[in-house]
Amino acid sequence: MSDTIAAIATAHGVGSISIVRLSGERALEFALKLSHKTKLTPRHATFTKLFNQNNEIIDEAIMIYFKAPYSFTGEDIVEFQTHGGFSVSEVLLEELVSLGARLALAGEFSKRACLNGKMTPLKALNIQDLILSKSALAAKIIARNMQGNLGELLEKIRTDLVKTLAFVETSIDYADDDLPSDLLEQISTMCEENSKILKEIYTLSQSKKGLIEGFKIAIVGKPNVGKSSLLNALLSYERAIVSDIAGTTRDTIEENFKLGTHLLRIIDTAGIRESKDVIEQIGVALSKKSLEDADIILAVFDASRVQDKEDEKIFDLLANTDKKIFWILNKSDLENVFKNTQNKNFIKLSAQKDITLLKEELQNYLNSFDSEGIMVSSLDLINACKISSEAIFRAKGLLEESSLELFAFELNLAINELARFTKDFQRDEILDEMFGNFCLGK
């Protein structure tokens, strides 16, 4: 990390300011050359003109120097706040490169912060998730995670496991000395408690992932029951073609919309029925796949049509799902001839006139999800918690069987999984993969 890196840290486009970030051993040197200053006071904003090597002015900017180790990366950092737009920040970046800086890789500033012990990989992931959060509720949950509760909990578990492993490996080295029975009981209890905590984290995160990622809602029904009209009503604009011709929607249509504080991804599916049309068959297959991926299902039926075999197929399709289903009887402003033989609690509405009741029911259901507690948005971390929990659970069983070598193996597996997120981690290839999806300048 001896080279000095530079990147534009703000989004590209027209705006009032752009920020160019510089980090490394020569950051201060480059800043002094650009500004024609002889010194900079750390953590002070300096208004200055910036010049290229031909002594031509680049811009007037605010320059802030953060002296190592008291900076985001732990290295010397200089941030330049220039006028916004496409050109000025690019010209400044080119000038920094000509002075000897290197263009930063995606996420390289955060990677250096981790390698220099300024943050854990877990906090870096939380920062990235916060940047990418799609709703106020998601941002709130992620910001809470950033306060350290999750990191402290995982580090405590990892530390417990390391201490336990030390006891057990000592016992393996000195095979004649058995572990005391009271210590064995303590270790068994520790394994049980920590496995349970990690299991709660990953199960809670999976069950409530919609609070962060957005809930997926699939609209399903036979052709021509008003699914596309319902989609348009939820979006409050005409997104899907509405026609009396059955089979108009042959592909899935997906759109995002917000309901209160919740981000929703709604999917209008092709009408499910038997068809010889190859294209329509593909659409029906996609519809069934959408149901598997959905968190919530809106099952739509037509109040103005007598229940038939195609309706029965919808009931059968949804009979064994564990997804939340809202049963909707559309076109209820017309003569109602649909017989509720399945005794479903239908929401009666007209998608072309008023869906207020459905929105209220949806919002009440979404609000019932408790946003408190520890939730993880990173799939990698969810998997790490799952792997660690299962390894510790297996270790407990092996301890009871006095298989100490295998116990140590399982504990090592759990420790290594947690260590990727809770402590300074030196395996560059894994960090490269982790931070490769970050923004430039972050």
Curated annotation (Swiss-Prot):
Chain positions recorded as Mg(2+) binding sites: S228, T249
GO molecular-function term, one example from the UniProt record: metal ion binding
E.C. code: 3.6.-.-
Family per similarity comment: Belongs to the TRAFAC class TrmE-Era-EngA-EngB-Septin-like GTPase superfamily. TrmE GTPase family.
Gene symbol of the encoding locus: mnmE
Subcellular location: Cytoplasm
Subunit structure: Homodimer. Heterotetramer of two MnmE and two MnmG subunits.
Main location (coarse class): cytoplasm
Amino-acid positions noted as binding K(+) in the UniProt annotation, renumbered to this chain: N224, S243, I245, T248
Source lineage: Bacteria, Pseudomonadati, Campylobacterota, Epsilonproteobacteria, Campylobacterales
Class of the enzyme per the UniProt entry, highest EC level: hydrolase
GO biological process: tRNA methylation; tRNA wobble uridine modification
Protein known as: tRNA modification GTPase MnmE
Binding of GTP, residues: 224-229, 243-249, 268-271
Domain TrmE-type G residues, every copy: 214-367
Pfam families: MMR_HSR1, MnmE_helical, TrmE_N
GO cellular component, one term: cytosol
Function per UniProt: Exhibits a very high intrinsic GTPase hydrolysis rate. Involved in the addition of a carboxymethylaminomethyl (cmnm) group at the wobble position (U34) of certain tRNAs, forming tRNA-cmnm(5)s(2)U34.
Cofactor(s) needed for function: K(+)
Keyword Aminoacyl-tRNA synthetase among UniProt keywords: no
